[in-house]
């Protein structure tokens, strides 16, 4: 008696669904790709409960005939290839005939479809892969597919679904990638009756970028174009000043298909060279047209991983295209645009002003217990920040106020203002080897900081500075050289650590609320994790599509830090996911202390330098910055005498050493 049997078709489809359909986003991907292959110009995706309850895809494509409709649920039944040779010149997104049978086997499926030639349309209803209804019906040309109760008969898969917000974020990401791959198609995504994404379908990729990432982001994207005998490369990449904390904003398309490829990602970064900060990544949409013979898409069940012939040549083409496009741009960030980040789009941009090329002079304000610069004139009652950049911000805001006064009769004062992301190019790379998102390094750093013990700091007498970076002081134990950035970073770290640790319900109302823009998937993920932000006193409310509004801020955060601080905290939250409040606050203290400390090449006057040393002496651990770097080094009197050979460890003569 034989023990090998042929599995029933429904069971085989359920097994195949385990590879093809991982989550609701997989269903959306497969069905939308079918709609694209059907030459649709409008595709609407509607979901309920993140797709677990209902997914409906409506298109205006070619549709299916009454005879073809039941065949579409047969495994490996397809209209896209007919012979073995077709497998090597695939230009459609689907070709295996697995998607619809797999979806039908684990859900209740309803298909309404009609072709332009048919007198009437057709409706098909299937449950668990079995057709229950097939009849004629009146319906517009195109196809409407409704998937209900996904995974109802595979409880193990349903059990391991993530939260509804997480699954919704995956759906949004899929629709966004497909929208970028096909800007000629008008996409609409509706979740529980609320529209999340909409693109115009004009064929303009930059317009699609604006619909997904926001207008401000699209304005800072530059187009790339290059070609050789085998490849055509086009698309858009962000200026080096516009970056993100992970690679999720890089989209690679081959013949209209979104793929994942580590080497091509590497080629994009290589195109930027040293223009990107460590741990930062660009926003990029790279559209590659390739002869189908050079690409094998029949590798992975989801077809997101493909094999490419001449991959090294393609990498070089992408890198060259990006580097040449960047070379043509003026990569010096607009000073007033960076400094006047709080100005709204309703105001005209002021003319560029030239800044004097002279060393920055930092001074100490004993009343505010902080440093400031005299490069610009600051009113006595203007808020003081932690470094010279913030002070210049204060001046720019005063200029903006003057502008409002002049145009008051023409336009009312804004009720909200768009926040700008911090420019990573403003950083001086004090810690290029440390990525705060490296969890292993971060965990070790936090453990060390948590176990610090109170230290005794020597009494120092400051007497000079070198290269605007190192302070010189003498004490009972000899000469001390202090790294001024590391010193104030330690001071600021302990300040922020204590302040953030005191987070309570004390909030300060903003006169003009801030708006913070995010991509669709990040917006949804942040909504799910909003309670973590609330723990540190950040309360963001949804305000339109992909936008949050901030109406008040915690008292420990100065108003001049709101834009950069909130964006940085959100980026950190998106990356760390399950971070504890304790760890989150420690990460925040480290991050803010580094960004708000004195940088290299800033000259300190004598009074300011002495005040910094006094603040350092009051720290719990004044000897290391939060990253573990030494704050100061010591040359004892004996060390100095040895270096100048005033004393020797032994009295062996040169003659005895054989020198003479």
Swiss-Prot record:
Kindly list the organism's lineage. Answer: Bacteria, Bacillati, Bacillota, Bacilli, Lactobacillales
> Where does this protein come from, organism-wise?
Streptococcus equi subsp. zooepidemicus (strain H70)
Recorded hits in InterPro entries, A to Z, give: DNA_mismatch_repair_CS, DNA_mismatch_repair_MutL, DNA_mismatch_S5_2-like, HATPase_C_sf, MutL/Mlh/PMS, MutL/Mlh/Pms-like, MutL_C, MutL_C_dimsub
Q: Does the keyword Isomerase apply?
A: no
Q: GO molecular function terms here?
A: ATP binding; ATP hydrolysis activity; ATP-dependent DNA damage sensor activity; mismatched DNA binding
- Which terms under GO biological process does the entry name? mismatch repair
Q: What is this protein called?
A: DNA mismatch repair protein MutL
Membrane-spanning ranges: none
Which SMART domains did the record assign? DNA_mis_repair (SM01340), MutL_C (SM00853)
The family assignment reads: Belongs to the DNA mismatch repair MutL/HexB family.
Name the job this protein performs.
Answer: This protein is involved in the repair of mismatches in DNA. It is required for dam-dependent methyl-directed DNA mismatch repair. May act as a 'molecular matchmaker', a protein that promotes the formation of a stable complex between two or more DNA-binding proteins in an ATP-dependent manner without itself being part of a final effector complex.
Q: List the record's Gene Ontology CC terms alphabetically.
A: mismatch repair complex
Give any Pfam family that matches.
DNA_mis_repair
- Keywords linked to the UniProt accession: DNA damage, DNA repair
């Amino acid at each position: 008696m034989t023990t090998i049997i042929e599995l029933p078709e429904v069971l085989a489809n359920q097994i195949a669904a385990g590879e093809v359909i991982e989550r609701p986003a997989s269903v959306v991907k497969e069905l939308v790709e079918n709609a694209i292959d059907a030459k649709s110009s409008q595709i609407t995706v509607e979901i309920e409960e993140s797709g677990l309850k209902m997914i409906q895809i409506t298109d205006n494509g070619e549709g299916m005939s009454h005879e073809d409709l039941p065949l579409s649920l047969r495994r490996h039944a397809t209209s896209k290839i007919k012979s073995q040779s077709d497998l090597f010149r695939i230009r459609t997104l689907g070709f295996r005939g697995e998607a619809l049978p797999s979806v039908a086997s684990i859900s209740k499926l309803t298909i309404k479809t009609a072709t332009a030639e048919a007198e009437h349309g057709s409706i098909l209803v299937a449950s668990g892969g079995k057709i229950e209804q097939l009849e004629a019906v009146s319906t517009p040309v195109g196809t409407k597919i409704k998937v209900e109760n996904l995974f109802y008969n595979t409880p193990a898969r349903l059990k391991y679904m993530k939260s509804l917000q997480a699954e919704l974020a995956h759906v949004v990401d899929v629709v966004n990638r497909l929208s970028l791959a096909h800007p000629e198609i008008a996409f609409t995504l509706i979740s529980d009756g609320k529209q999340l994404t909409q693109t115009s379908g004009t064929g303009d990729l930059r317009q699609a970028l604006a619909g997904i990432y926001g207008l401000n982001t699209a304005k800072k994207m530059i187009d790339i174009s290059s070609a050789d005998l085998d490849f055509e490369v086009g698309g858009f990449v962000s200026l080096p000043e516009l970056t993100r904390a992970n690679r999720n904003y890089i989209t690679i398309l081959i013949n209209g298909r979104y793929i994942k490829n580590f080497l091509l990602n590497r080629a994009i970064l290589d195109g930027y060279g040293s223009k990107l900060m460590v741990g930062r990544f660009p926003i990029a949409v790279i559209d590659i047209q390739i002869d189908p013979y050079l690409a094998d898409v029949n590798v992975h069940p989801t077809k997101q991983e493909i094999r490419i012939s001449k991959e090294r040549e393609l990498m070089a083409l992408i890198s060259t295209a990006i580097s040449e496009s960047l070379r043509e741009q003026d990569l010096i960030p607009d000073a007033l645009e960076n400094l006047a980040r709080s100005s709204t789009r309703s105001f005209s941009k002021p003319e560029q002003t030239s800044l004097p090329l002279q060393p920055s002079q930092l001074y100490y304000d004993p009343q505010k217990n902080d440093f400031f610069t005299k490069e610009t004139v600051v009113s006595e009652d203007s808020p003081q920040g932690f470094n010279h950049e913030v002070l210049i911000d204060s001046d720019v805001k005063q200029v903006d106020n003057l502008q409002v006064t002049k145009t008051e009769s023409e336009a009312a004062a804004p009720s909200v203002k768009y926040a700008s992301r911090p420019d990573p190019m403003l950083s001086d790379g004090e810690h290029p080897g440390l990525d705060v998102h490296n969890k292993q390094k971060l965990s070790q750093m936090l453990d060390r900081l948590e176990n610090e013990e109170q230290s005794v700091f020597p009494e120092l007498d400051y007497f000079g500075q070198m290269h605007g970076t190192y302070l010189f002081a003498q004490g009972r134990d000899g000469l001390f050289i202090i790294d001024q950035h590391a010193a104030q970073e330690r001071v600021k770290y302990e300040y922020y650590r204590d302040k953030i640790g005191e987070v309570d319900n004390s909030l300060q109302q903003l006169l003009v609320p801030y708006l913070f823009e995010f991509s669709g998937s990040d917006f949804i993920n942040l909504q799910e994790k909003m309670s973590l932000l609330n723990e540190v006193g950040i309360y963001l409310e949804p305000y339109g599509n992909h936008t949050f509004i901030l109406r008040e801020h915690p008292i420990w955060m100065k108003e001049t830090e709101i834009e950069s601080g909130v964006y940085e905290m959100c980026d950190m939250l998106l990356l760390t996911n399950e971070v504890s409040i304790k760890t989150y606050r420690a990460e925040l203290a480290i991050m803010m202390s580094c960004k708000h400390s004195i940088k290299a090449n800033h000259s300190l006057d004598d009074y300011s330098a002495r005040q910094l040393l006094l603040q350092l002496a009051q720290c719990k651990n004044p000897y290391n910055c939060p990253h573990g770097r030494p704050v100061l080094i010591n040359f004892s009197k004996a060390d100095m005498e040895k270096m100048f050979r005033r004393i020797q460890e032994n009295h062996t003569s040169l003659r005895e050493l054989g020198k003479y």
